[in-house]
């Protein structure tokens, strides 16, 4: 009952719930982002680029480990809530609005970008992979910090998984287009309350934060 799977998008949930009668709990790595205030503090203390959510180091790994562990141990009739992150406000959603799950849970789906990724050899960090790294991380502080997180705390989190499913994008070039489509849908669903919706330029910059880890994923996670 405690098998964890990652990389499966939410489109699989109705099939599992209705067709197989499986009790499924879904948690995205996005839902354990540090709060906006915590990321701003990290950006001031370590490197300004850490204000932008997404890369290893911008998640509350302890929260993720606790949630997955509690889901595995959830007994019959017991309930717990799952954290949720509001991308339209770039902050963790109010705890009172977190969804509730009732035990026992048969399957935990832990999905999202960078799940299952591994740290790079130190020598691979020397050369910037894009303009963002060249201009805003010229001394490599940010990318070394991110890499260190992957090799330590994130490795412990990913070790909790029993299986890994990777959905292969056709190329890195497809990712900005998909991200922009998500922003359009997010703006439509959030309405006037959306304060952090990205335009084309914003998406282009945002994706550069992810490039260093995404390209090895596409090459090696198959």
Which ranges hold each PLM region?
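Post-Walker A helix-loop "phosphate-sensing" segment adjacent to the P-loop in P-loop NTPases
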Residues: 14-25
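Single conserved hydrophobic/aromatic residue that forms the stacking wall/gate
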Residues: 2-11
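Conserved NTP phosphate-binding and transfer environment spanning the P-loop NTPase/kinase superfamily
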Residues: 114-222
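Structural alpha-helical scaffold elements that stabilize or flank donor/cofactor-binding regions
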Residues: 11, 101-102, 157
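Glycine-rich phosphate/ribose-binding loops and adjacent secondary-structure elements
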Residues: 91-102
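Switch II (G3) loop of P-loop NTPases
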Residues: 108-114
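Conserved nucleotide-sensing/catalytic segment adjacent to the nucleotide-binding pocket
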Residues: 25-28, 32-90
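Loop/turn-to-beta-strand initiation segments
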Residues: 77-78, 104-108, 163
